[in-house]
């Protein structure tokens, strides 16, 4: 008997997708990732579809991959998926030089990022009924 190749770090109701070395700065990518955190997966995909930011299409592709992983690898219900986390991390930084006036040069840094999206099945919470809004006299009498 051999050991499993890797230990599953996620819960059974979760799936993930990772995009590495995306050519955008982590700061800009985090703006798009913040849009989809804690959103239902279908609403997050719709928001990314109509986002005007360039990187939104790559984030959408990664989110769709996480949803596909949940459906095909873990048999989760696609309609119940919610974006649990969208983590953004730093990757490499390419250094380049830009020619300036008088024979000088300036250093240009091109940032890369990592993106990890975890989707989870939302737990069905029982519907809570709001108490009726009566006057203070009714509340004191009860």
UniProtKB/Swiss-Prot annotation:
Give the GO terms filed under biological process for this record: translation
Region annotation Disordered: where it falls in the sequence: 122-142
Q: Does the keyword Ribonucleoprotein apply?
A: yes
Q: Which domain of life is it from?
A: Bacteria
Protein function: This protein binds specifically to 23S rRNA; its binding is stimulated by other ribosomal proteins, e.g. L4, L17, and L20. It is important during the early stages of 50S assembly. It makes multiple contacts with different domains of the 23S rRNA in the assembled 50S subunit and ribosome. The globular domain of the protein is located near the polypeptide exit tunnel on the outside of the subunit, while an extended beta-hairpin is found that lines the wall of the exit tunnel in the center of the 70S ribosome.
Which PANTHER family does this UniProt record tie to the protein? Answer: CHLOROPLAST 50S RIBOSOMAL PROTEIN L22-RELATED, LARGE RIBOSOMAL SUBUNIT PROTEIN UL22M
Q: What is this protein called?
A: Large ribosomal subunit protein uL22
This protein's species is: Gluconobacter oxydans (strain 621H) (Gluconobacter suboxydans)
Q: What is the lineage of its organism?
A: Bacteria, Pseudomonadati, Pseudomonadota, Alphaproteobacteria, Acetobacterales
Q: Which gene encodes it?
A: rplV
